[in-house]
């Protein structure tokens, strides 16, 4: 799906569910990581996350578009467009738009684990942060530490 197709989709969804035209730009933003989309208040444009389209398909993308169009139309008409506003929640229910989008499966960053071992007493230290082995020593016997394993 390219920029023209997403623009057409947003315009169609706006007319079908809201009965009002979408007069601004809709585009994909590759920098969005965990958000499905966002409505920009100053430009009135809508940015969408392409990864949600890849992962969940067009149905989820239409849900995200409906959510962002709720922000758009309420803001344009001067009503409460924020998540906490009653107007926003009522319009979400009326057009059957999701309040939150699905969670990204690969959104969780894998944790790095560093395993250090004392050269003298063989005590192992498991750390999430890397330590300077020239500066720090074993807390038990003051022996030299050695990095055994680094997982990422």
UniProtKB/Swiss-Prot annotation:
Entry superkingdom:
Bacteria
> Which family is annotated?
Belongs to the SprT family.
> How, per the record, is the cofactor bound?
Binds 1 zinc ion.
Q: Which cofactor does it need?
A: Zn(2+)
Which Gene Ontology molecular function entries are recorded, alphabetically? zinc ion binding
Q: Which organism is it from?
A: Bacillus anthracis
An example GO BP is: response to stress
Answer whether the UniProt record assigns the keyword Chaperone to this protein: no
What the entry lists under HAMAP family is as follows: SprT_like (MF_00745)
Would I find Zinc among this entry's keywords? yes
Its recorded name reads Protein SprT-like
Catalytic residues of the enzyme? 68
**InterPro entries, A to Z:** SprT-like_domain, SprT_Zn_ribbon, Uncharacterised_SprT-like
Domain SprT-like: from-to ranges: 7-148
Q: Where in the cell is it found?
A: Cytoplasm
- Which key words are in the record? Cytoplasm, Metal-binding, Zinc
Could you say which residues bind Zn(2+) here? 67, 71
Q: What GO terms fall under cellular component here?
A: cytoplasm
């Amino acid at each position: 799906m390219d920029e023209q197709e997403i623009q057409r989709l947003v315009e169609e969804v706006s007319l079908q569910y809201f009965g009002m035209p979408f007069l601004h730009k809709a585009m994909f933003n590759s920098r969005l990581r965990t958000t499905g989309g966002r409505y920009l208040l100053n430009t009135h444009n809508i940015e969408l996350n392409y990864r949600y389209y890849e992962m969940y398909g067009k149905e989820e993308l239409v849900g995200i578009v409906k959510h962002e169009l709720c922000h758009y139309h309420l803001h344009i008409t001067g009503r409460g467009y924020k998540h906490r506003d009653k107007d926003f929640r009522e319009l979400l229910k009326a057009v059957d738009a999701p309040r939150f989008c699905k969670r990204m499966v690969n959104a969780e960053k894998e944790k790095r684990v560093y395993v250090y071992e004392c050269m003298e007493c063989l005590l192992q230290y498991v750390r999430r942060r890397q330590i300077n082995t020239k500066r720090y020593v074993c807390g038990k016997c003051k022996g030299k530490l050695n990095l055994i394993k680094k997982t990422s």
